[in-house]
Design a protein with these regions (language model features):
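Catalytic core and acceptor-binding pocket of nucleotide-sugar-dependent glycosyltransferases
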Residues: 53-127
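Conserved donor-nucleotide/metal-binding helix-loop-beta segment in metal-dependent transferases, i.e.
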Residues: 2-35
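Structural alpha-beta junctions
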Residues: 20-25, 90-98, 138-139
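An N-terminal, helix-rich hydrophobic module
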Residues: 27, 119-121, 140
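Hydrophobic, Leu/Ile/Phe/Ala-enriched alpha-helical segments that form helix-helix packing faces
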Residues: 14-22, 72, 85-91, 132
Length: 145
């Protein structure tokens, strides 16, 4: 659930940067975020470490098509995609994975501000309910009083 206006111009700049610099994945939501600066643009991006949890993530990102297709496995669900097994497959990828830095203590940073997890195990998170109520968006099973 997006809660602020998307900075489209910045997204377009990041797409161009990723394309021109042969980036495997440019994460637009630093969740988890990088720990080390990206050598080419250290104030804008950090490099993701292949050994970190959720190195492979389905958070908002700009993917190199071949990189993403290599990581997709038929009949695999989203939890498998983010698993350690798939992260090990990513060790074969030579293209770097980078991420925007967090702009504040809590994610997300970057050009798209959104609620990272709106539903957990079939239950709406309170932060998501609050946003839907604020925006007057009805959802099944929840009253918007």
């Amino acid at each position: 659930l997006i809660y602020k206006k998307v900075n489209t111009k910045l997204v377009e700049q990041y797409v161009e940067y990723a394309h021109n610099n042969d980036i495997g994945c440019l994460r637009l939501c630093p969740c988890p975020g990088p720990k080390l600066p990206w050598k080419h643009m250290p104030k804008t991006f950090g490099v993701l470490n292949k050994n970190d949890d959720y190195y492979i993530s389905l958070q908002t990102a700009i993917w190199d098509k071949e990189t993403l297709l290599y990581l997709l496995v038929p009949k695999q669900n989203i939890w498998h995609f983010e698993s350690d097994i798939n992260a090990k497959r990513a060790h074969n990828i030579k293209k770097p994975f980078i991420s925007v830095w967090r702009e504040e203590d809590l994610p997300p940073g970057g050009p798209i501000k959104y609620i990272i997890t709106a539903i957990t195990r079939g239950v709406w998170e309170q932060v998501a309910i609050d946003l839907l109520v604020k925006e007057n968006i009805p959802i099944n099973g929840i009253k918007n009083d």
